[in-house]
């Protein structure tokens, strides 16, 4: 693994049957998302500024005779196929010695533009890194699970190109920025949003730091997502009235975010949101 990844440099194997590992699957947001073109293979060429919130799902792993996965939490019921879950797939793609009993506490909404499943897989990669070390081809293994997974393994601000798997570092002058996530509790699958994109290339990312790129950027999937879930518009309008300096939709939606100058501004904004909406307040990593 690259030295700049921020992951633990030395393996920390299970020490006895009672030891457990715990990782947060940090919520992913796209501070900017520029879709450049449709590719012949059906995917899209894009440029995005990944950022991560200091909160998300929680995963725990304990030694067990065989791998297993238990899911609970507010959004656990949305994952009705544990064997098809990306956490189970991440376990299956990585050598990790004895079996692991993994518990996933699902706090992030599903199909929400937050990379929830990819973040969960990224947390598994970090747990395996701590306990056994990752194979040299970990990035390729992560990319096979999903376009956002390599970035979620690192869980640090970066630029993503190609389908999002080609990562580049960027000076992160947004770490610690107060952020509020809001979702109208309407799932929105990625495929239909990309299909509704108008195909117009509106240009590349611009800027030398995370703040500059975010401020100058846009989300090209916002308009197609709005055409499918008009309630996103109400979320954006409400957030823009709360004094944040940047409000935008994340990923393919329907979650939107606002960035603030102070935690007090963020907390007041969160308290002003309709109780029927899902919210999460935190800070950028």
UniProtKB/Swiss-Prot annotation:
Which one of the record's GO molecular function terms can you name? 4-(cytidine 5'-diphospho)-2-C-methyl-D-erythritol kinase activity
Q: EC number(s) of the enzyme?
A: 2.7.1.148
- InterPro entries linked: GHMP_kinase_C_dom (IPR013750), GHMP_kinase_C_sf (IPR036554), GHMP_kinase_N_dom (IPR006204), IspE (IPR004424), Ribosomal_Su5_D2-typ_SF (IPR020568), Ribsml_uS5_D2-typ_fold_subgr (IPR014721)
Which one Pfam family would you cite for this protein?
A: GHMP_kinases_C
Give a yes or no for keyword Transferase in this entry.
yes
| Binding positions (ATP) | 109-119
Output the SUPFAM superfamilies linked to this UniProt entry.
GHMP Kinase, C-terminal domain (SSF55060), Ribosomal protein S5 domain 2-like (SSF54211)
Q: So what does this one do?
A: Catalyzes the phosphorylation of the position 2 hydroxy group of 4-diphosphocytidyl-2C-methyl-D-erythritol.
Task: Note the NCBIfam families from the entry.
Answer: PRK14608.1
Protein name per its UniProtKB record: 4-diphosphocytidyl-2-C-methyl-D-erythritol kinase
